[in-house]
Structure formats: C-alpha cells, structure tokens
UniProtKB/Swiss-Prot annotation:
It comes from the Viruses. Pfam families: ASFV_360 (PF01671). Keywords: ANK repeat, Early protein. It comes from African swine fever virus (strain Badajoz 1971 Vero-adapted). The lineage of its organism: Viruses, Varidnaviria, Bamfordvirae, Nucleocytoviricota, Pokkesviricetes. InterPro entries: ASFV_MGF360. ANK repeats lie at residues 66-98. Belongs to the asfivirus MGF 360 family. Signal peptide: none annotated. This is Protein MGF 360-19R.
C-alpha cells in the first residue's frame, strides 16, 4: 500500500492543473501525470472540489466533474485496477465498487481494499439515491451506464425505488412505473431527469440511443416546463400528440408550468379545457394563468371543484366577475421570447383575487 506521503503527492499533482506554472510545459506536466497513474480515457485526471467541499474527478469526458465514489464505480466497471486503488487511496468508499463488479479479479481487489462481501438491497438504493445528488450531464449519463442494466437493481424493493423516482418525477411516477422492465423504467428515469433540468449533452445522449422514447421526452418537456426542448422536438416533427393532449400534460403534472402552457396555447390548444385540467389537479397558479389567457369555464370549473372537495377553488371561481383576459401577451412562439415574457410573471387575475381575499391563497 502506498505511503500517506505518496498519496498526498498524487493529490497535489492532480490539483496542479488549476495553478499557473511557468517552469514546465503543459505537455511535460501531462507526462508526469501519466507516469504517476493520473490518467484516464487517454487524458489527465484533474482533482477539484464542489461547493460542499466534496472531492470530484474531472477529465475531458467528465468535464463537469463526477464525485469520487461515482468515479470509483466507473473504474470498477471498467476493471481499471490502478484507478480503483487510486480512488480508494483518496477516500472513495470501496463498498460503492461492489455495485459495478463484473469480474472475480475486481471482486477480490475490492475485498482486499476492505469491501464487505455483498450489498444489502437497501444499500443499493442508498447508493443510487446519493449518486443522484449531482445533477449534471456527465453524472446522469454515468447513472445510466452504471445502474440501468445492473443485476443488483433487479431485486431492489420497488417501494423504495418508487420513492426515489417520485422525488424527481413527481406526478409522472405512475406513468413511468407502468413500464414492464426495471431497465426501461430506469432509462426513462435518467432521460426524464435530463429533460427536467435541461441537461443538453445528456438529452442528446439518450436521444441518439433511444429514438423510441421521443414521446417520453416530449411528455417530460411539457410536464417540467422545458419549452426550449419542447420547441426543438416540435419543429423537427418529433411530437406525435395533438395540441390538447400536450396542454393536458402541461397543466396537470406540476404548478407554475407557464412556458409550456403558453406554448400549447399559441399552437391552438383549448384554453377552457386547460383551465378544467388545472382545477382537477389543484394547480392554482396554472388555473389563474389560464384565466389570464382568456379561459372562462367558471361554472364547469366550480362543479368539478365541488365534486373534488376543493373549497378554495370554488371560492376562486365564484368571483368570476372580477376576472378578465390579460391583453399583454403576444403571438410570438419562439422559446426565448416566451421565457423573457414570463420571467417573474404573476397572473393579473391572481393579483385581483389577492386584493379581494388577502391571505386565502399563498402564492
């Protein structure tokens, strides 16, 4: 086992990329890194820290950086024994390596470095959960490569898996879990996270490999207010839903989906049906935005709200005399214009309601 001094020296070298050095060329510096085993995928390994002071590994492939434990899992999957040792020396949890073992040699090395015999089912879930903390394209792609077809995920508790999925996917969880295989569920899960957080490199990665999931991509763009990705899919004719189906998703999954609601409205979707969908899903901000766009299905909305026991919405819709369409909107459908128009937007009719009923709805 290398001495503590050797481990420290390698850390200092890996951190050296971020410091100016007039005495050696970049080529010679990279040569030193390669000789010291600080080399991965034909490129130097650079060590850095995130805002929480967690150690991260950067390479040209992982240019956004990946957490040390994630790097260990990838090194184990690749049977890169030198890096398994290196990342463990730097403090990676060797038990994380158990999730991606695919050879007996790698298993023996992990045991030698202190790993337990096997992971419990709840430990597998915890590793997935913690790895998901890092929302970048590099990390979401790695999640797919490490976990999607991993046999350890075949036997996890689906109740615990549902909790992880719901944490990120919210009301899309049931739709996602309707898929037959855990592999398909996980692939769509990572893809959905990429769309939700507009991780462009990850979106492109999944798009190139899973053309059959275009409708899922559109569903996520609508549900998570990603008007840029929605527009990209629409203008390239990758959307195979009608405008009202799209509006239904935009209004139902989460509140404050203003950009995608507005986009569907400009395409010609029925704004009264959008209003009723917002009532049904108790999305009050969406409801007021629909009224701003000209929705006037107040009686139908009240009937639906009474059936659901939504007393606050009944109160909102009973004051229809104070509401009127907002005339400040335009017909420009470009995402940049929509984002600019709706930045810090507050529905005119919600403001009118607030003045009549201060404190009833906390926006």
């Amino acid at each position: 086992m290398p001495s503590t001094l050797q481990v420290l020296a390698k850390k200092v070298l890996a951190l050296g990329e971020h410091k100016e050095n007039e005495h050696i060329s970049r080529e010679y510096y990279y040569h030193i890194l390669k000789c010291c085993g600080l080399w991965w995928h034909e490129a130097p390994i650079i060590l850095c820290f995130d805002g929480s002071e967690q150690m991260m590994i950067k390479t040209p492939i992982f240019e956004e950086g990946i957490l040390l434990n994630t790097a260990l899992m990838k090194a184990v999957q690749e049977n890169n024994y030198e890096l398994i040792n290196l990342f463990t020396e730097w403090g990676a949890n060797i038990n994380y390596g158990l999730i991606s073992i695919n050879t007996e040699h790698a298993r023996d090395l992990c045991r030698k470095l202190g790993a337990k015999e096997m992971l419990e089912r709840n430990e597998v879930i915890q590793i997935v959960f913690k790895t998901l903390d890092d929302i970048t394209s590099s990390n979401i792609i790695l999640c797919h490569e490490l976990f999607t077809n991993n046999p350890l995920l075949e036997n996890v508790n689906m109740g615990e898996m549902r909790m992880i999925i719901h944490w990120r996917m919210k009301n899309l969880t049931n739709l996602l879990l309707n898929n037959d295989s855990i592999s398909e569920i996980l692939t769509k899960f990572w893809y959905g996270i990429a769309v939700k957080y507009n991780l462009k490199d990850a979106i492109q990665y999944f798009y190139q490999r899973f053309m059959d999931f275009n409708e899922w991509r559109v569903t996520c763009a609508l549900s998570f207010n990603n008007v840029n990705d929605l527009h990209k899919m629409y203008i390239t004719e990758k959307v195979h839903m009608n405008n009202d189906e799209m509006m239904n998703l935009a209004c139902s999954i989460q509140d404050r989906n203003l950009s995608t609601i507005y986009y569907c409205f400009l395409l010609g979707a029925n704004i009264n049906q959008a209003m009723l969908t917002s009532v049904l899903n108790y999305n009050i901000f969406n409801l007021f935005f629909c009224i701003d766009l000209g929705a006037d299905a107040f009686e139908e909305g009240k009937t639906l709200a009474k059936q659901k026991g939504y007393n606050e919405i009944v109160e909102i819709l009973s004051l229809d005399i104070i509401y009127s369409p907002n005339t400040d909107f335009s017909s420009k459908i470009e995402p940049e214009h929509i984002s600019s128009l709706l930045k810090n937007f507050y529905p005119k009719n919600l403001f009118a309601f607030d003045r009549c009923n201060p404190g009833l709805y906390y926006s």
